[in-house]
Amino acid sequence: SADVAGAVIDGAGLGFDVLKTVLEALGNVKRKIAVGIDNESGKTWTAMNTYFRSGTSDIVLPHKVAHGKALLYNGQKNRGPVATGVVGVIAYSMSDGNTLAVLFSVPYDYNWYSNWWNVRVYKGQKRADQRMYEELYYHRSPFRGDNGWHSRGLGYGLKSRGFMNSSGHAILEIHVTKA
């Protein structure tokens, strides 16, 4: 099946079943995430980078994501007996010259933290880094991973709709569409 992290699939095929398949491929890991981002923006996206605040991925970001396609990606806590989650930001350059950034946060300790996610368009090309992480996590009204759908205008003629569950085995599904 092509429903593996690092693949690009038809956007219409993105859903919970696909993301569960991506998640299960990570095996028995306490904190992990499957990410699916559907490109209905009318633009082509080119991978820039992933910045991990904690955790890692063995997957290379899909390089090109055409309009009508969706990228699949995953992340997991660092291997070994370390008390970390998987927290990071994905950055894609869009064919209009701007950057699509997606934050995901799956904490280790649910007594203190919750799942969070965010999506934003930055003017110009910006690689994901610590500053972008801090802005998306602390200052740009992130959404809680609360098992519900959330929508937001992104500017630049775009809007987003996304869902994240509250589990340590997290799924994050985002659709970026024309406004």
From Swiss-Prot:
PANTHER family for this protein: BRYOPORIN (PTHR40388:SF1)
Region (N-terminal alpha-helix that contributes to the pore): 1-29
Name of the featured protein: DELTA-actitoxin-Afr1a
Effect of substituting residue 149 to A: In V60E/W149A; decrease in hemolytic activity, suggesting that this mutant forms functional but structurally weak pores
Domain-level remarks: Composed of a long N-terminal alpha-helix and a core region rich in beta-sheet structures. Before the pore formation, the alpha-helix binds the lipid membrane, partitions into the lipid-water interface and stabilizes the monomeric molecule on the membrane. Finally, it traverses the bilayer, thus forming the transmembrane pore.
Biotechnological and industrial applications of this entry: Has been engineered for DNA analysis in nanopore technology.
Record's miscellaneous remark: This protein has been found to bind carbohydrates, since it shows a substantial delay in elution profile in size-exclusion chromatography. The carbohydrate pocket ovelaps with the lipid-binding module of actinoporins.
Motif stretch (Cell attachment site, crucial for protein stability): 144-146
Highest taxon above the source species: Eukaryota
Binding residue positions for N-acetyl-D-glucosamine 6-sulfate: 51, 53, 138
Temperature dependence (free text): Stable up to about 53 degrees Celsius.
Keywords of the record: Cytolysis, Ion transport, Lipid-binding, Membrane, Nematocyst, Secreted, Target cell membrane, Target membrane, Toxin, Transmembrane, Transport
Site (Protrudes from one subunit (B) and inserts into the hydrophobic cavity from the adjacent subunit (A)): 60
Site (Part of the hydrophobic cavity (in subunit A) that receives Val-60 from the adjacent subunit (B)): 16, 149, 163
Annotated residues for binding of an N-(acyl)-sphingosylphosphocholine 3: 116, 137
Protein localization: Secreted; Nematocyst; Target cell membrane
Any one biological process term the GO annotation gives: pore complex assembly
Residues that bind an N-(acyl)-sphingosylphosphocholine 1: 31, 79, 168
